Amino acid sequence: FISQKNLYSIVALSEKEVVGFGSIFFFQRVRGGREGIIEDLIVSRNYRKLGIGSKILKNLISEAKVQKCFKICLESNNPSKDFYFKEGFLKGGSIMKYFI
């Protein structure tokens, strides 16, 4: 895994082959409290439905607790939403984007 002050990443391996990856960024909110943003959670197609994604996610959540975050946010595509709901995430708010 890679750990820096505001970034934590983890790699899942199977016999030296990368089969999953997760990363979370941390930042301090202006009004107080730290927040985590899950940037990536990827599992190779052939290794899905084996619990690897759940293990990666639990690891990211654990690190967010160590970092004393009060919440974790992420953006998800439609096929992944059920996975995140199953893991205890709630739908909330609207995300607006401005691409540069």
PLM regions with names:
Residues 38-41, 71-74:
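Conserved hydrophobic beta-strand within the GNAT/NAT acetyltransferase core sheet
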Residues 27-38, 48:
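A conserved beta-turn-beta hairpin within the catalytic core of GNAT-like acetyltransferases
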Residues 43, 49-62, 86:
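Conserved acetyl-CoA-binding loop-helix of GNAT-fold acetyltransferases
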Residues 1-9:
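Active-site rim helix/loop that mediates acceptor-substrate recognition in acyltransferases
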Residues 54, 66, 70-71, 77-100:
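Conserved active-site alpha-helix within GNAT-family acetyltransferase domains
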Residues 11, 17-26, 42:
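Conserved beta-strand in the GNAT
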Residues 20, 24-31, 81-85:
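A short, acidic/glycine-rich surface segment
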